């Protein structure tokens, strides 16, 4: 058996785990967004 690729991308999973709403739900998530805004990131979350 060969080893399979461990990254099997799924859009729904990506957005549920790393999305904007998930970030806004927790205090630390909001800190992440604030840091990324301060840095001037074009994209804040997945």
From Swiss-Prot:
Gene Ontology molecular function terms on file: structural constituent of ribosome
Top-level taxon: Bacteria
GO CC, one annotated term: ribosome
Pfam families in alphabetical order: Ribosomal_L34
InterPro entries: Ribosomal_bL34, Ribosomal_bL34_CS
Keywords: Ribonucleoprotein, Ribosomal protein
Signal peptide: none
Gene3D superfamilies referenced in this protein's UniProt entry, alphabetically: 1.10.287.3980
GO BP term, pick one: translation
Similarity comment: family membership: Belongs to the bacterial ribosomal protein bL34 family.
NCBIfam families, sorted: rpmH_bact
Protein's recorded name: Large ribosomal subunit protein bL34
Species annotation: Latilactobacillus sakei subsp. sakei (strain 23K) (Lactobacillus sakei subsp. sakei)
Source taxonomy: Bacteria, Bacillati, Bacillota, Bacilli, Lactobacillales
């Amino acid at each position: 058996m060969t080893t399979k690729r461990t990254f099997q991308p799924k859009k729904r999973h990506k957005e549920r785990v790393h999305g904007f709403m998930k970030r806004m739900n927790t205090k630390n998530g909001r800190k992440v967004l604030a840091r990324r805004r301060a840095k001037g990131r074009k994209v804040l979350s997945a």
